[in-house]
Structure formats: structure tokens, C-alpha cells
């Protein structure tokens, strides 16, 4: 038997919080403000954590031309400045070279008017009963417990190690998760079960 779980909201609380900022060319306060405003239209948990960390009312009149690219990030004009906020691949596609954080968490990279402006590191908390759930699966005869996540490899591996998961797949977009599930289904022996939680 194989159980595959999505990380956010299943194994973790889905309540992200800012753990660290590395601002480049701008102040940390300006970095957080621009990120929160650029993400102001999004309901994604990461966007919510940025708005929460900003802690002020969001003036949507300051934000124009918002374009959200699912699984990658957002582009917006904030106070006339072109802001990109998203994962490393999103900024690389824009011709920038984002830094790779060494700390565990999900990095929201920022660019302002085509210049890299650093990253904001966001982390989630493992649910208190997640380890018990994994143990219960094992006791029920599940041979493989795997996790899919859009998070960075370091964040995914930290959760996988803590919960003693057999397989961890990071940097997954929604389409990647579907492909992983199809691959798991294809390699199942006859009579075996695949469950996605």
C-alpha cells in the first residue's frame, strides 16, 4: 500500500510565518511592504503570512496590474514600481539570479524594477498529530509514505526527516503532483492500493 500526502494543511498547519528576511538594495521594511502589497489579492497561505507580517492595512489603490502565475509568484505594479514576488524559478525566468537561502523554509524572492531585492523566508509548523498519523499508516501495513510539496528541497526534507517519510518530492507545481500520482499508480502491483491525502 502507498499513501501520498500533500504537505501544506495535511502534515503541517498551513499557517506560515516569516522567519527571516534578507533585503538587497532596499530596507527590510520596504521589502516586506512591497511583497505584502504585491501579494494583496492572493489568498494563498504564503501571501497571507506576508500580509500578516506586514501588519498594516493594505491600501489596494497603491497596487495595479496584478498577474498571478500559479505555483510561481506574482507580478504587480506597486506605487509605480514593477514588483515580482515568487519562487527562485520565477525570478530566474525574468533574467535574475536569486540567492539560495541556507535556512529551512520557503523563500519568497523579490525584484523591484528588474533588480533583485532579496528574499523573505517563510516556514510552516508540523501538525502535532502528523507523526502519529504516519505511524498509524505503517501499523496498518502501508509500505510507502510519501509527501508532495511546492516547497524548497530543504523545507521538504526537514519535514520528511522529522516524520520519517519514505519519499519526499519538492518544488512540485499542481501539474507535477498529478504526474507523481500517475507514476505511483503505474508502478503499483496488482491488488495494491494508492491513497492521496
Locations of regions flagged by a protein language model:
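Cytosolic catalytic headpiece
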Residues: 1-197
Amino acid at each position: 500500500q502507498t499513501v501520498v500526502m500533500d504537505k501544506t494543511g495535511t502534515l503541517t498547519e498551513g499557517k506560515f510565518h516569516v522567519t527571516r528576511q534578507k533585503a538587497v538594495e532596499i530596507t527590510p521594511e520596504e521589502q516586506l511592504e512591497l511583497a505584502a502589497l504585491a501579494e494583496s489579492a492572493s489568498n494563498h497561505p504564503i501571501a497571507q503570512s506576508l500580509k500578516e507580517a506586514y501588519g498594516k492595512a493594505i491600501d489596494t489603490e497603491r497596487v495595479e496590474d496584478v498577474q498571478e502565475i500559479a505555483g510561481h509568484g506574482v507580478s504587480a505594479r506597486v506605487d509605480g514600481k514593477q514588483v515580482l514576488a515568487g519562487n527562485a524559478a520565477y525570478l530566474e525566468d525574468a533574467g535574475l539570479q536569486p540567492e539560495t537561502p541556507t535556512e529551512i523554509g520557503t523563500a519568497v524572492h523579490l525584484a523591484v524594477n528588474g533588480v533583485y531585492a532579496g528574499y523573505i523566508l517563510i516556514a510552516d509548523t508540523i501538525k502535532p498529530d502528523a507523526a502519529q498519523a504516519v505511524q498509524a499508516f505503517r501499523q496498518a501495513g502501508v509500505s510507502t509514505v510519501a509527501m508532495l510539496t511546492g516547497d524548497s528541497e530543504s523545507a521538504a526534507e526537514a519535514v520528511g526527516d522529522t516524520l520519517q517519510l519514505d519519499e519526499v518530492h519538492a518544488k512540485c507545481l499542481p501539474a507535477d503532483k498529478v504526474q507523481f500520482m500517475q507514476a505511483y499508480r503505474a508502478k503499483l502491483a496488482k491488488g495494491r492500493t494508492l491513497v492521496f491525502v
